[in-house]
């Protein structure tokens, strides 16, 4: 068994530590309409195509009830599209500031390439959003061999189509010769649905939802508890392995290759 390619998520995995770029924008577009949503609610659908993320928020029972209290009816598709248009406009203006590679990512990518491993990527961002993020990340030294957005396939996560398109472009088959690395539940489902080894990264993830400063200053016992909650969430949603930082990824690769493991 040889791992031939690794498919990475972007925000919260390789760039934008903590995946903060979309968070406040989601909260802002609901606040503007008199509907308050929490940070936890805003994060829950992270990893989905962003219009699907807005739709998922409106379908949460508490948010739907609050919307009905304010407007006298449940959110409509018109409401969802109006909010998404506002979301896009605000997000485009701030994305360049949220494309910095997470510490250690560039070094890990370089090491993987030395092993002959190809680097692909998937995302919940649209192609237009990723044109901004990928360009800025490349200027800072991170550029995967291939990028697929939900715009390029029939549907985004949790469907496996973005992973399949990476496999075709990178010329890697069967799918168990590839690893999917991400920081959200939808990443785990995407990888498993594609028949790939699936790895959840915890520190810097949307699921953990902490800044670097918060991680560094937090009581070690409290931080460990939060890490274990995220680890369990990843495993419950299909992760074969979890890592706290990207630097642990090569150990996972060596384990898979040496043990001749089979995806179950």
Curated annotation (Swiss-Prot):
Q: Name one GO biological process term.
A: DNA repair
Membrane-spanning intervals of the chain? none
Write down the EC number.
3.11.1.1
Relay the cofactor remark from the entry: Binds 1 Mg(2+) ion per subunit.
Q: Which GO terms describe its molecular function?
A: magnesium ion binding; phosphoglycolate phosphatase activity; phosphonoacetaldehyde hydrolase activity
Active site (record annotation): 9 (nucleophile), 50 (schiff-base intermediate with substrate)
Pfam families hit by this protein: HAD_2
Q: Which reaction does it catalyse?
A: phosphonoacetaldehyde + H2O = acetaldehyde + phosphate + H(+)
Q: Which GO terms describe its cellular component?
A: cytosol
Q: Which UniProt keywords apply?
A: Hydrolase, Magnesium, Metal-binding, Schiff base
Oligomeric state and partners? Homodimer.
Q: What protein name is recorded for this chain?
A: Phosphonoacetaldehyde hydrolase
Q: Which organism is it from?
A: Bacillus cereus (strain G9842)
């Amino acid at each position: 068994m040889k791992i031939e390619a690794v498919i990475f998520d972007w925000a919260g995995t390789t760039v934008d530590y903590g995946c903060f770029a979309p968070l406040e924008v989601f909260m802002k577009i609901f606040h503007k309409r008199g509907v308050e949503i929490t940070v936890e609610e805003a994060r829950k659908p992270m990893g989905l195509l962003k219009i699907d993320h807005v739709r998922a928020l409106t379908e949460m029972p508490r948010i739907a009830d609050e919307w009905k209290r304010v407007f006298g009816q449940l959110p409509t598709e018109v409401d969802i599209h109006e909010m998404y248009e506002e979301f896009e406009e605000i997000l485009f203006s701030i994305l360049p500031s949220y494309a910095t590679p997470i510490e250690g990512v560039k070094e890990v990518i370089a090491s993987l390439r030395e092993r002959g491993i190809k680097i692909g990527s998937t995302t919940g961002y649209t192609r237009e959003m990723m044109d901004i993020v990928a360009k800025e990340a490349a200027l800072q030294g991170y550029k995967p061999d291939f990028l697929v957005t939900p715009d390029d396939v029939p549907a985004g996560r949790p469907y496996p189509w973005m992973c399949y398109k990476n496999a075709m472009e990178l010329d890697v088959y069967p799918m168990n010769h590839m690893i999917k690395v991400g920081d959200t539940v939808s990443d785990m489902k995407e990888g498993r649905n594609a028949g790939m080894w699936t790895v959840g990264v915890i520190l810097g993830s949307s699921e953990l939802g902490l800044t670097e400063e918060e991680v560094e200053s937090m009581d070690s016992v409290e931080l460990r508890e939060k890490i274990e909650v995220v680890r369990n969430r990843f495993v419950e949603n299909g992760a074969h392995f979890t890592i706290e930082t990207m630097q642990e990824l090569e150990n996972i690769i060596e384990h898979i290759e040496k043990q001749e493991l089979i995806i179950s």
